[in-house]
């Protein structure tokens, strides 16, 4: 075992070996193989390439060197293309702070039987008058940044439960294609986390319809790990034991305290702001809240490519419309 594996239990070390192809004898060589690929993408500002950081991406891609590098590149490219999201990227930012306090996201105290961290979202808690959907996404990404520092979670991963109870049609109408694409690319394509399951509970018909629309844009692996339980909490309990769930999910624990995870981040004053800023990338900043621009989010193109700054055509303008139109 190398110092890079020091935070892992014997059980997790064995899991990393069997499931992720992690080999302590070649660990430094594996990391260097990924680091050597950085020069192939001069259009991206790789702000971190230290051993511990690259190891997260290797674990997320089961030590396939090229796939790990591609994820590393997409991680920084996403931040480079959406710089405004990562300005004031800290728990004390007003929008992030309020989203955290409303439970975006929450984190249960107990791990599941696979050692995974259970994240929870209560969708109806979103107060549109105080913070935006982008703030919610920023709060989730900041939380994941803090959690992924735990090497146990790098190996074991996460599960997510979203409770859609009382989430209104009006709230759902704010979920535009570009907002959803921003979330999908930020979480599915650009972050070194292993998601073992995403569970929808109490979802109304319009959320089911929304999922049908975005499903083709999800990776096959992601689609297989999304479970639509509706009001059937028994099917949820077959996958996540009720002994570790709060009462909102039919569990045996008291109701979830929405501010638990927010207090954790705020008490530690978690701040990732210094990593991703305008000066580091030295590139134009885009106002994500203002435009959620359809000319962004094209993973294969560099933000410094002037051809990206083109006029929207009609099809792109249509993409700015809500998926669920209000009468």
UniProtKB/Swiss-Prot annotation:
One of its GO terms (molecular function) is phosphatidylinositol-3,5-bisphosphate binding. SUPFAM superfamilies: CRAL/TRIO domain, CRAL/TRIO N-terminal domain. It holds the Pfam family CRAL_TRIO_N. Residues 289-327 are annotated as: Disordered. Its main location: Golgi. It is found in: Golgi apparatus, trans-Golgi network membrane; Early endosome membrane; Cytoplasmic vesicle, Clathrin-coated vesicle. Keywords: Cytoplasmic vesicle, Endosome, Golgi apparatus, Lipid-binding, Membrane. InterPro entries: CRAL-TRIO_dom, CRAL-TRIO_dom_sf, CRAL/TRIO_N_dom, CRAL/TRIO_N_dom_sf. It comes from the Eukaryota. Residues 96-257 form the CRAL-TRIO domain. Required for normal morphology of late endosomes and/or lysosomes in neurons. Binds phosphatidylinositol 3,5-bisphosphate (PtdIns(3,5)P2). Binding to PtdIns(3,5)P2 is not required for localization. Forms a complex with clathrin heavy chain and gamma-adaptin. This is Clavesin-2. The gene is Clvs2.
């Amino acid at each position: 075992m190398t110092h890079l594996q020091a935070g892992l239990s014997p059980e997790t070390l064995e899991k990393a070996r069997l499931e992720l192809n992690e080999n302590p004898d070649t660990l430094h060589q594996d990391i260097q193989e990924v680091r050597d690929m950085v020069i192939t993408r001069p259009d991206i500002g790789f702000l971190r390439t230290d051993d511990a950081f690259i190891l997260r991406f290797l674990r997320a891609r089961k030590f396939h060197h090229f796939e790990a590098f591609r994820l590393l590149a997409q991680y920084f490219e996403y931040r480079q293309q959406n710089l405004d999201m990562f300005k004031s990227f800290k728990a004390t930012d007003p929008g992030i702070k309020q989203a955290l306090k409303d439970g975006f996201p929450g984190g249960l105290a107990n791990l599941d039987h696979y050692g995974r961290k259970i994240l929870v979202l209560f969708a109806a808690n979103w107060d549109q008058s105080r913070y935006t959907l982008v703030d919610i996404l920023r709060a989730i990404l900041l939380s994941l940044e803090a959690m992924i520092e735990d090497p146990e979670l790098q190996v074991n991963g996460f599960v997510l439960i979203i409770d859609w109870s009382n989430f209104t049609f009006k709230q759902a109408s704010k979920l535009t294609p570009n907002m959803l694409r921003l979330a999908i690319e930020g979480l599915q394509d650009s972050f070194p986390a292993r998601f073992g399951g995403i569970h929808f509970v109490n979802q109304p018909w319009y959320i089911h319809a929304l999922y049908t629309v975005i499903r083709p844009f999800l990776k096959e692996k992601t689609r297989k790990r999304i479970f639509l339980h509706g009001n059937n909490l028994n099917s949820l309990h077959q996958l996540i034991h009720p002994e570790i769930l709060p009462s909102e999910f039919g569990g045996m624990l008291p109701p979830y305290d929405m501010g638990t995870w927010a207090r954790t981040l705020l008490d530690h004053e978690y701040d990732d702001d210094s990593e991703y800023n305008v000066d580091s990338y030295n590139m134009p900043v885009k106002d994500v809240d203002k435009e959620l621009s359809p000319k962004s989010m094209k993973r294969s193109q560099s933000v410094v490519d002037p051809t990206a700054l083109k006029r929207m055509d009609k099809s792109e303008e249509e993409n700015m419309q809500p998926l669920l139109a209000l009468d």
